[in-house]
């Protein structure tokens, strides 16, 4: 709906592709403010912006069709920024922004809230956002299943036991047969995907540090590695936008943790790596 006025003025598929790229690019604005919160100087912020623009996940996903996931980077980054600023209204508006994108966008908001609860001890605001996200998610799924065309839970059939065709079925599989789930997540095709997603960030999201960073990997595991739906683990499509946004934030957190390594050097290496993968 936000893009409809532009489409009315310039109807056509080309304008939709351009608008999608612009929407994704807007994510750099809250990203810069997040970088400033982590004590980055302007030169470092420029490098961080370059990483964002050339990050293959963001750039490659712009070239195929149009998808509501394009709003995830800017929405998630705004929510993270609002939490870091401890802005009540910012958190409220950003949470609404994220939840309004699609039903499963609530999962990203939930993981951000969980991370803020444990890493920044923002118990009250974090728990409220978490509960709102969970209630919204199950409410939206119920509505779609009963009054719409149903959710796309069939894309998770490989991790949902027969007769348990819902989100709870995924949780059951993880608890009952974790070895099977592990095999689904780290097969050869998924390992190639992990390299493409992580290498431009120098694998910083999984660099040893504070354990809370593991929380930010949740959507990657859930949406991109667990399902066998091939497009979920293909950066040429938009299904990695949300997960990659959290990975990028995790990389920023890791850079701040690595006090002995100059931020400029790490960001420069990330920029070069992103450009190389972008060109490959």
List the predicted regions and their residue ranges.
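Hydrophobic/aromatic-rich transmembrane helices and adjacent perimembrane loops
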Residues: 107, 214-262
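Hydrophobic, aromatic-rich transmembrane alpha-helices
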Residues: 181-184, 192-217, 221
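Perimembrane helix-loop-helix junctions
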Residues: 108-134
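Short acidic/glycine- and proline-prone juxtamembrane loop motifs at membrane-interface regions
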Residues: 60-69
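Short helix- or helix-capping micro-motifs
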Residues: 45-54, 81, 95-99
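Signature aromatic-anchored transmembrane alpha helix within multi-pass, membrane-resident enzymes
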Residues: 43, 130-134, 258-280
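Transmembrane-helix motifs of polytopic, lipid-linked glycan transferases
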Residues: 18-38, 78
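Membrane-interface transmembrane helices that cradle and orient dolichyl/undecaprenyl
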Residues: 37-39, 71, 76-90, 117-120
